[in-house]
Amino acid sequence: MIDAEGYRANVGIVIINDMGQVFWARRYGQHSWQYPQGGVDEGETAEQTMYRELHEEVGLKPEHVKIVASTKHWLKYKLPKRYIRHDSKPVCIGQKQKWFLLKLTAAESSVDLLHSSHPEFDDWRWVSYWYPVRQVVSFKRDVYRMVMKEFANFALPLTYERRPDRRKRRA
């Protein structure tokens, strides 16, 4: 679904584990890494899209995760000119995204990147909370920064709940 301004409706998914690390996936056959994301189909809500994309791209089901938060607003980024397909109608100039923060409640072995007949990702790993902001492709960086700032109050307490006390104790 592309709106009148040329933005495609899309959802983005940040998955966090018990250690406060986030799920980071490599695009199939490429060197670029990103969060799972995907377009909203006609008649779908953002939450329905999120669950569909979560299953298609990561192999996870609703019972494997818990919704912790979602962004208050749709966040936009423009595509670089080289990625805009002017021959398709309507022309898509970028994405507007609703983001979800999910807590993985199932075992990591539930992740199955090859679940789909057309996998989006070929590798994944857990990374520190802010790592993706520095590593994502440049045209998505501002949106990633906004998302991670908005989710920090929800995600970072989860990080510190499970971390062992690293302070040295004095006798």
Swiss-Prot record:
Its EC number is 3.6.1.-. A motif (Nudix box) lies at residues 38-59. It comes from the Bacteria. InterPro entries: Nudix_hydrolase, NUDIX_hydrolase-like_dom_sf, NUDIX_hydrolase_CS, NUDIX_hydrolase_dom, RppH. Residues 6-149 form the Nudix hydrolase domain. Pfam families: NUDIX (PF00293). Its cofactor is a divalent metal cation. GO terms for molecular function: mRNA 5'-diphosphatase activity. Keywords: Hydrolase. One of its GO terms (cellular component) is cytoplasm. SUPFAM superfamilies: Nudix. Accelerates the degradation of transcripts by removing pyrophosphate from the 5'-end of triphosphorylated RNA, leading to a more labile monophosphorylated state that can stimulate subsequent ribonuclease cleavage. This is RNA pyrophosphohydrolase. The gene is rppH.
